[in-house]
């Protein structure tokens, strides 16, 4: 039920960028520019910053082509080695360079050729632990080198390797072995494929070779073309021993990315009418697939498609010529979460090795740096409008489920709406009766009414399309948030970070302006009378977003930037709750817990899950020092409850006294926690709604003494009302027998 939301985005114009990688020590991007047909010079650049990007030249040198057959040399691998603080650059002509920067004295960098391969290099890649470099030469040999560039092993890729994995075939699927008489189709075994692939080449076969390591560095996979045979994926151990070779797959292309968790390798299979991402196991056998799609147009028009898993195996990036797609998987369904336009032609994408959702993408004209977070697009949890609204993005489709009406597990949903391009973000308006969908072509406004206490299908009320002048090629919409009955759009354009306000039914062209500060995250707070929006900058300062007065600094703040945060008001005092990437949850600047995985705010509670598989309830207070976090003892403390391993909060419905949890696989569970039920019963007693309070006491097995003990004087003064609301004599007997 989670979407991807942007928290950082920046562009840097730079010509002829050929490769990029991350320096995790400084969170900076290293990239190479050149060589080109006009110049054989290579520049090593260091890109700093997130929104305001600067470029520093680290080193430059001349790298002419070593052979007349290669007109222009090419960078086939770029890697920053943290252990030695050097940058390794591998060129197609066969040279391997290292660049040692002098970061302390600021002197000239040391550039050295540490090795050269006469046959030329098709591709190369360092292992995740930076201990081994795998080089595939143009003579079809695989060379494994140590960290000091000494050869560890050398093997030759031959047609005999295809016999390494003895995939058994007894002719199933071939015409000669199939019964073709009457009723043959009905009798066919569904586990047997209708057609057995022979390894026919793709229509866009480019003869490229790709290397991908498993996350633990124990195995490396090489996707290459075996002349006279087919394209094959070979898996080698760290010692250079052949472990397996893939089965024949028609239309398999040159890209390959091994999921760091190790269970699957992803490749591209081009079929006559579609393009699939095909998955392989380590033994070379197929293990499922999904079909690529894009609201921007048919994906079959793209000649070369590349794949890159992020470091924690949660997101698969699909890189096209002018587009990056981010895909996630839940409940065995693949969701298209984001489409990011880039300048053609894209040259590479590099995920940050430690911050899993940060990446750098390069094209021939610029470098893009972005970062996303997983977040749940939920509506207000303020009764009586807490319908449990949650929206899930899947390309141009928005899947909506009001959990107060129905608990429908993903990938299904109660309602589905479609927009004209890939959705970027969703924001719910006041009382959850309106919402806006931000996509690359504009903003769609919807009315979401309720009928007889149940949510009905949303109705499109207005479309606000972006003008060409407003969203030129460099403009990228990032986020949207509700401010009262308006919606504020945040985007990245040529002049920097900009925002504007939009309103349903208003077709006037708004003015995109630069705010006083760059907001990396936004949230909303709704009480009975208004809907307020708040933002957070990179320093952890909190600001109120207003239409008339712009950004207003709040007296409370975090000590650093929190990717996830919510605002609550207790007795008129603002309390901010924030969650860091390492699981620390804060109330203003006070640390509450160090093992939080998700949290939700209701009018009375802070609810959060922990990596010890508990869900905890903290009663809100205006003084953050008075907030009491329960210990891990669900048997003695009703504010702590055990949950399934890996559960995360989706939303809370105080009116139903329930929370919705999502398991790691993707299935949902509705839980009625004791702390929430008791708080809800107390609220019903305060409202003199004894019928519902009694009903919840029965169904949730709460001691009925609470009906009297919570408000004794009120109960004695309203005995007649109590009897009128509960006319059943057996219920009265049950209540009287429970009194102590």
Tell where the protein language model's regions lie, with residue ranges.
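Solenoid-repeat scaffolds in large eukaryotic assemblies
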Residues: 693-697, 731-732
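A cross-kingdom feature marking charged/low-complexity
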Residues: 656-665, 717-740
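WD40-like beta-propeller blades
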Residues: 1-647, 669-680, 684, 706
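Short, charge-rich amphipathic alpha-helical segments embedded
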Residues: 695-726
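Canonical SH2 domain fold
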Residues: 642-644, 650-654, 659-671
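Alpha-helical repeat scaffolds in large eukaryotic proteins
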Residues: 218, 222-225, 270, 622, ...
